[in-house]
Amino acid sequence: VRHRYVTDLIVSSDSVGNGHFSDYHRFFSHAVWSIDHLWKCLAILIVKTLISKDATIVLAGDDTLCRKRGLGIFGTGMHHDALSSSKNKKICHWGHDWVDLCIVIANPWWAPTKVFALPICMRLYRNRQGLTKGKGKSGKKTTASQRKAASKKAKKAAKAKRKAAASARAVHKVDNTPRKTRPELMAEMVALVASWFPDRRFVLVVDSLYSGESVLSTLPDNFDLIGPVHAKAALYAPAPPETKKRRGPRRKQGDRLKSVGAWEKDGTRWKTFHFDQYGLHGSLRVKTRTGLYYKAGKDRLLRFVLSQDTVGGRPTRIFYSTDVNLNPQKILSIFSLRWAIEVTHFDCKQHLGLEDPANRVPKAV
């Protein structure tokens, strides 16, 4: 943790004089923590305090990069930096990639025009690039003796590295299970939240990274999902009813539906909706139909919405909802609330020091 971090907590929480300062340091360094239990207590408090009993709970899921420096920090790697990247140039940065899940509080009574995304669960995504920092190729030619010496040095370093890794696993009990992808981490958190509130109904809004098979195919019964469809995804009509007996298994999907461009140009009438809400301002023309996103959700029936900006500021995209009874306006309105999680990421980094901790021990991270 950064220098004087716990002391800053004591001062900012107005706890000076309530006890000796060493009590606070001992609490954070020696107490046994169960972070998921802490998340559960926070989620229950938010739901009981800010959400009515019969309301559907809206969740937003995404990931964010916390930039770090140095190889000693546990769990760091090279990740895509969406903040620094542009449409034509992709930039990666060294740091932690956190996948998080937030409860969306829309238009509360104390702030009727605001939407807040309050984090209730997080997971650290780890990739295999954590040991490649600073190992650039040299442009100078090496002699045979230099290569031999470098090879000997590399073998010695590899042996020391294996020994250090074995020691770290013994001391810190590092989990050696296969690494999970970000969508798999999101699916894990969704299942966890569903177990906390088995009697509540949820709507999860995500971007295109989390709207595929890993999340959709494992969606709990009390969850609905709203997200964008991949631009090149194959959509199908529902399987037609069997009119006569035939050999083999029953069809699971019907004919393939039109692509985004073909659906945009066909003769189906557009409907225009005007939006003036948090995250979405302007007029959109939409078309809707039901079908299957077979690669992601198998034979689960979905509601598809083709959205086109009348001004041309937004790309034409297809969104889907697992609740086929929702109308297009409601689907787009709920999806626009996802922007609140981006604001939460920004505020946590700028005002709460999310990027400041630099821990070298797995449990501390």
Where are the language model's segments positioned?
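Active-site-proximal, Lys/Arg-enriched surface segment
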Residues: 29-145, 289-290
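Short, flexible loop/turn elements at secondary-structure junctions
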Residues: 28, 62-65, 105, 208-210, ...
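Electropositive nucleic-acid engagement tracts
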Residues: 2-81, 191-192, 199, 244-245, ...
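Short acidic alpha-helix initiation/capping motifs at coil-to-helix transition points
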Residues: 1-3, 324-325
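Single, function-defining residue in the core of a domain
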Residues: 13, 72-73, 110-365
